[in-house]
């Protein structure tokens, strides 16, 4: 039987409101690539429910429908990830394309597919074939082409099965950025200052690796690294039009990417997530409740894409990403699953001595000069000739920066086989019980995740997952020399990460905070030391432990909970009546809720972030403007504040709150009733 025959794909668009049926429209498409007829039903929320008669047809239709709804978004995602923006947007994007190509997966595709499970390649083939089927449909019906393509003057590309897994730039990467920041602080002020600015957990004191001079790290060493995952700044396409003169056809513009990198910084602000699962014994239904709220920036179109896949062997609904097959957050008929980031340190910045010998670049490794590997990529450029770009690699990874004496490369676990971000969900979303779920997570690579679990039998569980490098003689918190002294000695088996199954307390919960058990041998098996502050997880635990009759509505309320634990901890140590007006009146009546119309919340947040925290850190470190070094940690600030004498506490509070009041008045006027957070 042929697998590629013309079948009918019925698209039923149900125009339902919550109150009444407005009507229904049925559209039929003739699509090559399906094994049997399939159907998409769109509910009143806009969620596609995909019904297929064959297992892999569900993924084909998922790809088709993702293209039908989000073609320009996923086409742009593919071009950005593969380094093909210049072909359609012009010469201003050559450097960003170069950066993206440095971080493509370039290893064995056999090993890559095998790492995800037995049918990963087949799923990717079906999904990308579905996307291509919609692109073919546009060729036959040009009126279906999304407006963005028309405005920018190009056509959507065809996909190959390897595209979604070769792209690694859509993950939430870890910790090269903080390594460089820490090196800068160590150079200018000493590591003792960094320990105050950001707490390390579990309790840890880092040291400068032998042979590293922190002052050798260039300020812009991470430009290509950051560009590789930066969003697309379309202003550059307008600003740098392809030259009209043939004599200039090979000239590339000098592009300032500061705005592009600022867009990336905006995306990463306050990134974080929460999840929890409550056991039947603590709910009012006698069944487990699982909740997950990933905190990613609002965007149009959205990062997430909700879908429901039904076919033999699969019935799963939830959220994934439009350019990937499967569901990463959701449930099937027997299990539910949700994720947050778990801070495994999966990166190192490697510093080499380097030289040029003839037409080769070399780096020093174990007292020998070793040739860098060179890949020459051809980047197509709109309106110009293609550009040949040499990409350099060491034994550790791609070279992102070099000067006359040194070269800098990134060693990253997520460049290993099986590490395409979120692609591993195709395995665990089909699990039917805890053991199958664990088995799937033991193959999960990136990004490192806290997974919570619940099933229809009443079980709950928690399992972190991600590829964890084995570091035996360093902690990964600073760049390291590339001379062979600081190596990874493979990776830990996934089952060595801690797990919980039906814990006695009746719930599991995570919020990006440090979640290693107290008896975990963190000094011998280093996972990472950089976690989110514990405010969110402490609030979640507080609520979940306060009742044995947890409801669905309790989880919904907790996802929208605005109680500020920093405010409660700090203000209970202060004599509020002695604060200047209007702080005394606002704080004395405040319930610590960060409501958008709360004048007290407005004043507190401006005070805490702009004045109190910088003033405390400046007092402890002696640095006039510590906020210029890094994002300051309010947990560290409160910890340090609590060590002050009573007189110093009064002085800090008095000075900083007065500055905050003036700041808010300048922003929103003198009437506190008009202050809004």
Question: What is the predicted role of each segment?
Answer:
Residues 19-23:
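Sec/Tat signal peptide C-region and signal peptidase I cleavage site
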Residues 25-289, 294, 318, 627:
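Substrate-recognition/specificity elements adjacent to catalytic centers across diverse enzyme folds
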Residues 347, 401, 406, 446-547, ...:
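Hydrophobic alpha-helical segments
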Residues 187-193, 199, 203, 246, ...:
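Ordered core of a single globular domain
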Residues 58-62, 107-122, 411, 422-428, ...:
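Second-shell loop/turn segments in exported
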Residues 6-18:
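Bacterial N-terminal signal peptides
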Residues 315-316, 320-386, 426-430:
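Compact, glycine/acidic-enriched structural inserts
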């Amino acid at each position: 039987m042929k697998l590629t025959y013309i079948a009918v794909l019925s698209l039923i668009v149900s125009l339902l409101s919550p109150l009444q049926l407005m009507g229904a429209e049925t559209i039929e498409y003739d699509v090559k690539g399906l094994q049997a007829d399939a159907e998409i039903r769109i509910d009143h929320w806009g969620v596609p429910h995909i019904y297929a008669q064959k297992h892999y047809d569900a993924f084909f239709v998922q790809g088709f429908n993702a293209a039908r709804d989000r073609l320009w978004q996923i086409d742009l995602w593919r071009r950005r990830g593969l380094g093909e923006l210049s072909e359609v947007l012009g010469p201003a994007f050559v450097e960003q394309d170069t950066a993206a190509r440095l971080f493509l997966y370039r290893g064995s595709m056999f090993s890559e597919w095998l790492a995800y499970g037995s049918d990963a390649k087949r799923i990717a083939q079906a999904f990308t074939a579905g996307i291509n089927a919609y692109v073919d449909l546009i060729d036959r019906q040009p009126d279906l082409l999304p407006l963005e393509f028309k405005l920018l003057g190009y056509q959507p590309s065809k996909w190959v099965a390897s595209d979604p897994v070769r792209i690694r730039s859509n993950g939430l990467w870890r910790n090269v950025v903080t390594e460089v920041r820490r090196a800068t602080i160590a150079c200018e002020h000493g590591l003792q200052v960094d320990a105050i600015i950001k707490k390390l957990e579990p309790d840890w004191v880092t040291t400068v690796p032998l042979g590293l001079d922190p002052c050798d790290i260039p300020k812009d060493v991470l430009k290509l690294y950051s560009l590789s995952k930066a969003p697309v700044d379309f202003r550059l396409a307008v600003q740098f039009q392809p030259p009209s003169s043939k004599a200039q056809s090979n000239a590339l513009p000098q592009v300032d990417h500061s705005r592009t990198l600022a867009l990336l910084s905006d995306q990463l602000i306050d990134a974080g997530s929460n999840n929890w699962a409550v056991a039947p014994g603590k709910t009012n239904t006698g069944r487990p409740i699982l909740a997950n709220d990933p905190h990613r920036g609002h965007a149009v179109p959205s990062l997430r894409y909700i879908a429901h896949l039904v076919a033999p062997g699969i019935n799963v609904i939830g959220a994934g990403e439009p350019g990937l097959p499967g569901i990463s957050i959701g449930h099937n008929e027997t299990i539910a699953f949700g994720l947050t980031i778990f801070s495994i340190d999966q990166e190192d910045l490697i510093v080499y001595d380097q030289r040029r010998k003839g037409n080769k670049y070399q780096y020093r490794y174990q007292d020998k000069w070793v040739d860098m590997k060179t890949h020459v990529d051809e980047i197509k450029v709109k309106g110009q000739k293609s550009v040949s770009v040499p990409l350099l690699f060491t034994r550790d990874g791609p070279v992102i920066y070099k000067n006359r004496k040194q070269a800098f490369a990134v060693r990253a676990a997520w460049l290993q086989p099986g590490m395409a971000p979120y692609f591993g969900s195709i395995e665990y979303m089909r699990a039917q019980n805890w053991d199958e779920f664990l088995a799937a997570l033991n193959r999960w690579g990136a990004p490192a995740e806290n997974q919570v679990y619940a099933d229809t039998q009443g079980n709950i569980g928690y399992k972190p997952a991600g590829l964890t490098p084995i570091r035996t003689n360093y902690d990964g918190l600073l760049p390291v020399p590339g001379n062979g002294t600081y190596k990874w000695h493979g990776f830990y088996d996934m089952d060595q990460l801690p797990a919980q199954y039906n814990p006695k307390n009746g719930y599991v919960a995570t919020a990006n905070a440090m979640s290693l058990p107290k008896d975990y041998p963190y000094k011998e098996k280093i996972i990472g030391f950089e976690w989110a502050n514990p405010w969110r997880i402490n609030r979640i635990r507080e609520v979940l432990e306060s009742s044995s009759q947890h409801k669905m509505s309790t989880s919904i309320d907790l996802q929208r909970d605005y109680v500020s634990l920093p405010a409660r901890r700090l203000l209970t140590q202060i004599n509020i009546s002695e604060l200047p007006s209007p702080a005394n009146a606002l704080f004395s009546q405040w319930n610590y809720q960060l409501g958008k119309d709360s004048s007290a919340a407005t004043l507190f947040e401006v005070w805490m972030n702009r004045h109190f925290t910088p003033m405390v850190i400046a007092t402890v470190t002696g640095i006039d403007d510590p906020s210029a070094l890094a994002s300051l940690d309010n947990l560290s600030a409160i910890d340090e504040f609590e060590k002050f004498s009573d007189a110093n506490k009064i002085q800090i509070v008095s000075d900083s709150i007065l500055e905050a009041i003036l700041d808010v008045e300048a922003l929103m006027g003198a009437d506190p009733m008009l202050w809004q957070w």
